[in-house]
Amino acid sequence: MKNCLNICLPVLFAVFAVALARGQNDQNEIQITRPVSSLGNTRPIPVSIEGFDSEVTAILKFDLYVQGFTFVSPETAQYQISGSSTGSVVGRVVDRFGKKTLFSRSYNGATLRRQAHALTDDIVFAITGKKGIAQTQIAFKVQASNGNGEIYIADFDGHNYQAVTHDGTIVSAPAWAPGRSALYYNSYKRGNPDIFYHNLTTGERDDIAHYTGSNISPAVSPDGSRVAMVMSESGSPNVWVANANGSHPRKLTSTSEDSSPCWSPDGQWICFATKIHERRVLAKVPAGGGEVQVIRTPGTPNPTEPDWSPDGKWIAFTMQAGEFDICVMPADGSAPPVILVRGEDPSWSPNSRTLIYARRTGGHYVLSLLDVYTKQVKDIHQILGSDSEPAWAR
């Protein structure tokens, strides 16, 4: 890492104390307190942008803001970004403090938007040493007022969206297969909550889990060979694992009310939400079967919807104490969770820095991006209806 944001998330956990208090009506009230000690160097990177037209400038600012940058005058910027966008995008980045040019190049692409995204990713890599997210994709659910919905995919900022399904029924929980060529999701297309595999190249799809009861919450292993899911064929909803095509399902848990499985990036563990001794908790189980282990999340009641970061270090999840909040904790449990922002359904970016999540506003859901280090938030381009249950392609 090459700049002022080269800090580790443990700094955040070390300086936040999360206390759980009970109100007079036994209502859970979450209080976040910050000691006098500094949060660490979590300030955004100051950059200036000059020379581009208004469209490209807006794209660059959006892309960079949700990755920890802020915008100042050239005289006060740590990095100066300049260029042009007449016909194609040309960009140059100068380290004003180091007095050197980091790169200068031109871009080709179908649209100025795609060229601007490519420039953003080069800027992020040149300054931070990390891959950017501007050319990534997301999947999500768009729900109409009648409760039916469709699965959509889009660029990470919500642009260039397209519908994957056209079924006019209840859908949920899109999950990407590796390579961004296919999705798994839950659909009532055949009158039962089944899990479908959908090839995005050919448009073909298969109903891979259509057992008696519910078949929901698909999660694909990092190598794409297996899919975890929640099925209630045996009565209680439990975590199962099957081959990618749905064959040879194997029950992994016998706990109560399991939901929202996700994989560790090494494919060795499955994290999920469950109920033990009448309490909602997060737990993990070996992907090949074995003992269920509870993951402690002190100060964050009713945890659910976990997502394991691609670098293996963090678990983001939703907690509920009256309202829904997004939390992040070390995957090894070495520090308590930190409550970051109001929302639900968090999904990690491929570089384990930004979260996309759903937040409720004005009676519907919108998707927002959160830079975990700086807590900078931006709503993505609104699609149609109510947008929720995002999944980031990795």
Report residues per predicted region:
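Residue-level detector of Asp-centered blade-edge/turn motifs that repeat once per structural unit
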Residues: G132-A134, P178-G179, P222-D223, P265-D266, ...
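Amphipathic beta-strand/beta-sheet edge segments enriched in Tyr/Trp
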Residues: T76-D122
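A structural "domain/chain start" motif
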Residues: R22-F62
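Bacterial N-terminal signal peptides
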Residues: C8-A17
